[in-house]
């Protein structure tokens, strides 16, 4: 993971542990965060100062979204990564759900490669709906790269719909 640079990274989302793991593994990163987190005292300020993007660019967050998107291309070119959980929420059954296309649109706009990551078993350690860690079972958390979509030419990046199909295909192949 440490070798990934200048990329948009999409990952399945199973548990509240997932963003913490990716933050720990990725040296220079930004991410798209649920907009409501930006309204929380102190935490919202920290997210804004860290360069994170609100998931919605509506209302009071429009200016922040525009500012962050305008700087994204140079951030990626300097070796930074943008990671996102494109489902926008945790999966309750472990299967990939419908994807929001925001990260894929940013990849096209910035002509950045898209790395598709798959996390496994974080939901067994920190089950959605539970408050405590489940330490009664033996569990191995894994994270692997299951696809990398490289731009072939600045003017020839696949459409957002094609990128979405390829991401979904990579996840569905892993679920078999």
PLM features per residue range, with description:
Residues 1, 37, 58, 120, ...:
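Short, solvent-exposed coil/turn elements at secondary-structure transition points
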Residues 1-7:
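A short, well-structured juxtamembrane/interface segment
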Residues 2, 15-16, 89-90:
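A short, conserved beta-strand element in the Rossmann-like catalytic core
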Residues 2, 46-47, 106:
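Structural alpha-helical scaffold elements that stabilize or flank donor/cofactor-binding regions
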Residues 4, 28, 49-50, 78-79, ...:
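Structured helix-beta-strand junction loops
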Residues 7-61:
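Catalytic core of membrane glycerolipid acyltransferases/transacylases, capturing the structured
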Residues 66-176:
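Non-catalytic C-terminal accessory region of glycerolipid acyltransferases
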